[in-house]
Amino acid sequence: MSVHATDAKPPGPSPADQLLDGLNPQQRQAVVHEGSPLLIVAGAGSGKTAVLTRRIAYLMAARGVGVGQILAITFTNKAAAEMRERVVGLVGEKARYMWVSTFHSTCVRILRNQAALIEGLNSNFSIYDADDSRRLLQMVGRDLGLDIKRYSPRLLANAISNLKNELIDPHQALAGLTEDSDDLARAVASVYDEYQRRLRAANALDFDDLIGETVAVLQAFPQIAQYYRRRFRHVLVDEYQDTNHAQYVLVRELVGRDSNDGIPPGELCVVGDADQSIYAFRGATIRNIEDFERDYPDTRTILLEQNYRSTQNILSAANSVIARNAGRREKRLWTDAGAGELIVGYVADNEHDEARFVAEEIDALAEGSEITYNDVAVFYRTNNSSRSLEEVLIRAGIPYKVVGGVRFYERKEIRDIVAYLRVLDNPGDAVSLRRILNTPRRGIGDRAEACVAVYAENTGVGFGDALVAAAQGKVPMLNTRAEKAIAGFVEMFDELRGRLDDDLGELVEAVLERTGYRRELEASTDPQELARLDNLNELVSVAHEFSTDRENAAALGPDDEDVPDTGVLADFLERVSLVADADEIPEHGAGVVTLMTLHTAKGLEFPVVFVTGWEDGMFPHMRALDNPTELSEERRLAYVGITRARQRLYVSRAIVRSSWGQPMLNPESRFLREIPQELIDWRRTAPKPSFSAPVSGAGRFGSARPSPTRSGASRRPLLVLQVGDRVTHDKYGLGRVEEVSGVGESAMSLIDFGSSGRVKLMHNHAPVTKL
């Protein structure tokens, strides 16, 4: 039978064209753009992940870009995994071999391959997390004779991290000291130098080193930088507004700036939103995204303003709040999904009343609609605000999880066993060695440890080598009992190293048995110790699963030629080190309400969101009230919190909130006043108080019942302070006033409490007495 030409079906869209289906005009432009740097200004909920993944897929399908030529950088492992899976769904399994990872994971891969270029480092280096760094800094501080109470490990760690984020090395920090430098700057510079020396001696890098050392390698060895520029012709960076200076320089080095070396710059695409820049306290600088068009003059900028997450009422509230920030790029989120429900507002008597309202609303939603517990999130400005919420949720029988609490890999028992594994992988890891030397107890006390440490310092060997010497009787001042215990410790590790080829789960089991760690917990009658056993069993399961996943991945295709195979143990330890808060947020279906800070909530979305604590001094935070830069960041935080909600948003504040054990009268947050009132359905507003209204007692605020303890005669007189005044605080002790701002009930001072630090307090609500 003949077929006429007119009967033939027209060709359908190509696979590349199909990638553009369902995108709005701005999203399509972002996907297909080529030839110059691209800045995608992606408003909250505007589909940036879809754009990024479609752009990557389009590079492969339409432009013939190889998988190995693409580098995509995210801020969490969870986001990286989601991006990879989405691209695999669009173009197939080949996308699994694309480099999609966090900044830190990307740098680890580069450094594992280039470790030989860094003096004193080899490819199986340990990665010290915040706790490891603080432990090492405590050792360094004590050895240098510093007052650990005045210069705490946390204070030193933050200061050194800030220097590293600015790519300032120890020599530059020392050289930068002047006659005007304060004691803290001098202490930090001296500690920084010794801290780095000990890190290198332990064959270890901390988080900030991962970025800084990679930048140093790329800048010191042009041929290495050229290699990666040739390889990664397309670099995509998500959440660019959250980058710090070191990350900014890293991206610049990977992309290249000119063709002087014969390699044209790579094609750079960054996605971000200055309105969601909320991590200045971690070193992030909003300038990176605000100045992108100046740094890359031929940039194409595309704004994504159509929102696919929230209702228009929620978006209008967010738009109104963020519009008050000066100097921002004009952008207004909109949706075609309709106005939706009004925002629900509630003014509570105190934090307990606020928590009760939240719990009652959650209970009503879960009982009377399609909303389930895992659809609900409760946000607050600071971690300590969760206490009253947790108490009420427990009484109400509402299941919940606090995100950002003690994470699985931060629990003591997990850290102990991971420390054993790290020593097996890197015998020079002094911090891990000293953590487990007498854990569980095996008769190696502080004095014996100190003798070994002195021997290591005097002979110029590592702590691990000094332990071997101690086992051989070469360390002075050690008694026979300690020598025997150390010899047993060294022998135990020799035996365990013979099992490094075992399945990872079996190796963890062997560590638990051979060290006696499990036996000690099993012998305990403390219920908490039994919970620790459960956690260790979970660690064994995680290790087994990791081994299986790694074997399956290896069977699918060849290993990356740019990354040396450091073994399953090193890979596992790397993953443990780089896990983040956002990677442990419960998945949908967990059946629990999620509690978290506003900072942790960034990047997430929930059908129902409660944002609590809308009070000046709480949100915005007290320290931001007199600082325009910090106040702008607090406003961006409000914008982030509001735009997490998909269907329903609740905002609440308390008239009185406890602070330092005292009731504090809290003015309404200025951010709450910036939301158009027609968008809010106030379930309860602030009643006008009677003259003798209780502010902290059992009665409802505004009740006519007199309060004998708060009568006019017994009220605390208004505290008036001036610069230079000496005061005493119930918690911080003696202090001197440095700055004063505000008047009357709103007056506050910045007070230097010496070793307790500088604290900003409200005169009338803090337990402060003028001397």
From Swiss-Prot:
One of its GO terms (biological process) is recombinational repair. One of its GO terms (molecular function) is DNA binding. Its EC number is 5.6.2.4. One of its GO terms (cellular component) is plasma membrane. Residues 312-603 form the UvrD-like helicase C-terminal domain. The modification N-acetylserine is found at residue 2. Induction: Up-regulated during mouse infection. It catalyses: Couples ATP hydrolysis with the unwinding of duplex DNA by translocating in the 3'-5' direction; ATP + H2O = ADP + phosphate + H(+). Mg(2+); Mn(2+), Cu(2+), Ni(2+) or Co(2+) also support ATPase activity. It is an enzyme of class 5 (isomerase). Its cofactor is Mg(2+); Mn(2+); Cu(2+); Ni(2+). Pfam families: PcrA_UvrD_tudor (PF21196), UvrD-helicase (PF00580), UvrD_C (PF13361). Inhibited by EDTA. InterPro entries: ATP-dep_DNA_helicase_PcrA, DExx_box_DNA_helicase_dom_sf, DNA_helicase_UvrD-like_C, DNA_helicase_UvrD/REP, P-loop_NTPase, UvrD-like_ATP-bd. Optimum pH is 7.5. Residues 1-21, 691-716 are annotated as: Disordered. DNA-dependent ATPase, acting on dsDNA with a 3'-ssDNA tail, unwinding with 3'-to 5'-polarity. A minimal tail of 18 nt is required for activity. Also highly efficient on nicked DNA. Involved in the post-incision events of nucleotide excision repair, as well as in nitrosative and oxidative stress response and possibly in persistence in the host. Inhibits RecA-mediated DNA strand exchange; this does not require ATPase activity. When combined with UvrA greatly inhibits RecA-mediated DNA strand exchange. NCBIfam families: pcrA. Monomer. Interacts with RecA. This is ATP-dependent DNA helicase UvrD1.
